[in-house]
């Protein structure tokens, strides 16, 4: 997925290696399979080839700008990820290459204690 407005720092807070596959956007906002991908790793500007996989050890981070397509997963175990980002509307700022839901469906069996932004409409709090 990519973001329209949001810039985000993704931080591997602990656990295994965080792998991030990266692409840049073309002029139409689609995945560009050839363009280099500029990012900042721990504050240092770096350039990657389209489709490269950046691997972050615990304590390392990457800054992804709007238009950077990214897919991430834990390699060889679970990873605790932290995110610090610019203010945005997560309901409209996420663009997915293939239509998927942002969160998996949850069968609610107790009342919510802490709400996500996307929960407010469901709980009639808007």
Where are the model-predicted features located?
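Generic structural hydrophobic/aromatic packing signal, biased to beta-strands
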Residues: 20-22, 56, 64, 72, ...
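Residues in well-ordered beta-strands of folded domains
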Residues: 1, 21-23, 82
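Conserved metal-binding segment of the jelly-roll/cupin
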Residues: 50-76, 82-86
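Short, conserved beta-strand element in jelly-roll/cupin
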Residues: 5-26, 39-46, 55, 87
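Short glycine/proline-enriched turns and hinge-like loops at secondary-structure junctions
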Residues: 3-4, 12, 74-77
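Double-stranded beta-helix
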Residues: 26-47, 73-126
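Short amphipathic beta-strand/extended segments with alternating polar/hydrophobic composition
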Residues: 1-2, 33-35, 55-57
């Amino acid at each position: 997925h990519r973001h329209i407005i949001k810039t985000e720092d993704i931080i591997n807070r602990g656990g295994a290696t965080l792998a991030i596959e990266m692409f840049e956007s073309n002029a139409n906002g689609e995945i560009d399979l050839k363009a280099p991908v500029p990012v900042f790793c721990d504050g240092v500007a770096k350039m990657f080839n389209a489709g490269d996989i950046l691997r972050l050890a615990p304590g390392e981070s990457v800054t992804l700008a709007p238009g950077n397509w990214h897919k991430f997963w834990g390699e060889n175990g679970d990873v605790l990820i932290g995110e610090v980002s610019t203010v945005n509307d997560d309901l409209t700022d996420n663009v997915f290459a293939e239509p998927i839901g942002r969160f998996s469906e949850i069968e609610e069996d107790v009342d919510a204690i802490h709400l996500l932004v996307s929960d407010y409409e469901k709980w009639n709090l808007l």
